[in-house]
């Protein structure tokens, strides 16, 4: 990145900042607008602020379904996941499991009381939960969070102990790369469910995941 690297908090970033390359984990709308202006003026921003906006969950859900990417249906018999649609989960209550339609309706009402009217609904898919981390250059790793116990909000427990079902790893990587191209991000990660039959479903995708399990390697 050169000989001079400066770190700055997202809320302190301003139009006066000047650099050739911006490595950004920003999510605030104001900051993204500033970064888009930097991109428009020729600066390299990783991840692109335009790409980060396209990772908004409700927008991405529509795009993935239109492109035929394997994602859970909105109807199912094993419960539902209600997910805040305007951003990635920042709080435990932003992604909620509902055992049936009645509970889903209750949780949607709870979202409205919190001022949240943008959401998506995904049917729960039984199977192994895997988390993947990737960089556009070809780096791709996946892990079973229920093997190491590392969890952000504990929702991983809903899928139980990993059975390590066989699946097409190259296919998962190719699908993740397709989503990265659709959104325009270079550093990304997400979650997928692997069913007993070996099928996989993308249940989450985001820019700049934690890389907690492979940070040094990445």
Residue ranges and their predicted role:
Residues 1-75, 87-88:
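Conserved N-proximal alpha/beta basic substrate-recognition cap immediately N-terminal to
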Residues 27, 85, 124-125, 133, ...:
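Anionic group-transfer/hydrolysis microenvironments
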Residues 32-35, 57, 91-93, 131, ...:
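Short glycine-/acidic-enriched loop or helix-start segments at secondary-structure transitions
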Residues 80-103:
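Conserved anion/nucleotide-ligand pocket segment
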Residues 81, 118-121, 187-190:
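A short linear hydrophobic-aromatic micro-motif
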Residues 98-183:
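Phosphate-binding site of ATP-dependent enzymes
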Residues 180-215:
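Conserved metal-phosphate-binding beta-hairpin within the catalytic cores
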Residues 218:
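Catalytic phosphate/metal-binding cores of nucleic-acid and nucleotide-processing enzymes, i.e., regions
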